UniProtKB/Swiss-Prot annotation:
It comes from Pongo abelii. Pfam families: Ermin. The keyword Phosphoprotein applies. The keyword Phosphoprotein applies. This is Ermin. It is found in: Cytoplasm, Cytoskeleton. Plays a role in cytoskeletal rearrangements during the late wrapping and/or compaction phases of myelinogenesis as well as in maintenance and stability of myelin sheath in the adult. May play an important role in late-stage oligodendroglia maturation, myelin/Ranvier node formation during CNS development, and in the maintenance and plasticity of related structures in the mature CNS. The modification Phosphothreonine is found at T237. Its main location: cytoplasm. The modification Phosphoserine is found at S73, S214, S226, S230, S233. Residues 1-61, 108-251 are annotated as: Disordered.
């Protein structure tokens, strides 16, 4: 059997040209990889010339071991060179969890788990219930007031036996009341005017009587002051006496006529007409 070197060339690892020395033992590569902090375990390959299998089986084993070492070294290099990616992944997972905990809606997780709604605390539920009650109370009060008003109206209609008066009826009733008040005021004014007329007529009658008495006194004084020696004055003919009686009769007739006819005119007329008629009667 021929001796087979138990080393990997540098060209097999990364495809570069081999170094001038020609070969590098696999033990050095394994020692460098163990120095790196990695969670993945790997095994050292220490070739032994004693009891080696055939050439084909040895080559297959070497290829498998080389692939494993390459994969582990690549992962370690990525973690060392880009630690930010690892932090980003962790931060993203934390934010996803926080959002899922705070949200009240149902959310689906990446693995397919379904999150239920987070129940609110007792204080928040009580606050919401109080707000709903406050909003519902005024609506219920308005509905109750409307129902009460309708019930009162229906009861009044049943009790009275007729419907309530409309606005037109109210206006007519107000107009009738105003008309009655106006008529009463006019009647009161008429009564006052009649009383005033009666008072004025009484004053006129009193003046008329006073004038007649004064006239009779003046006539008596004139007859006493006349000379008694004159025969014509002493001898009074019987024809002259009726003349005096006629004058008195005329004055009485005029007064009676004034008291009957003109009294009505004065009572019906206004103040100016009353004054004019009184002056005309005085001139008679």
């Amino acid at each position: 059997m021929t001796d087979v070197p138990a080393t990997f060339t540098q060209a097999e690892c990364n495809g570069d040209k081999p170094p001038e020395n020609g070969q590098q033992p696999i033990t050095k590569i394994s020692e460098e990889l163990t120095d790196v902090d990695s969670p993945l375990p790997h095994y050292r390959v220490e070739p032994s010339l004693e009891g080696a299998p055939t050439k084909g089986s040895q080559e297959e084993r070497r290829k498998l071991q080389g692939n494993m070492l390459l994969n582990s070294s690549m992962e370690e290099k990525i973690l060392k060179e880009n630690p930010e990616e690892k932090l980003f992944v962790v931060h993203k997972a934390i934010t996803d969890l926080s959002l899922q905990e705070t949200s009240a809606d149902e959310m689906t997780f990446r693995e397919g788990r379904q999150w239920e709604k987070i129940p609110l605390s007792g204080s928040n539920q009580e606050i919401r219930r109080q707000k709903e009650r406050i909003t519902e109370q005024p609506l219920k009060e308005e509905e109750d007031e409307d129902r009460k008003n309708k019930g009162h109206q229906a009861a009044e209609i049943e009790w009275l036996g007729f419907r309530k008066p409309s606005q037109a009826d109210m206006l007519h009733s107000k107009h009738d009341e105003e008309q009655k008040v106006w008529d009463e005021e006019i009647d009161d004014d008429d009564d006052d005017n009649c009383n005033d007329d009666e008072d004025e007529v009484r004053v006129i009658e009193f003046k008329k009587k006073h004038e007649e008495v004064s006239q009779f006194k003046e006539e008596g004084d004139a007859s006493e002051d006349s000379p008694l020696s004159s025969a014509s004055s002493q001898a009074v003919t019987p024809d002259e006496q009726p003349t005096l009686g006629k004058k008195s009769d005329i004055s009485r007739n005029a007064y009676s006529r004034y008291n009957t006819i003109s009294y009505r005119k004065i009572r019906k007329g206004n103040t100016k007409q009353r004054i004019d008629e009184f002056e005309s009667m005085m001139h008679l």
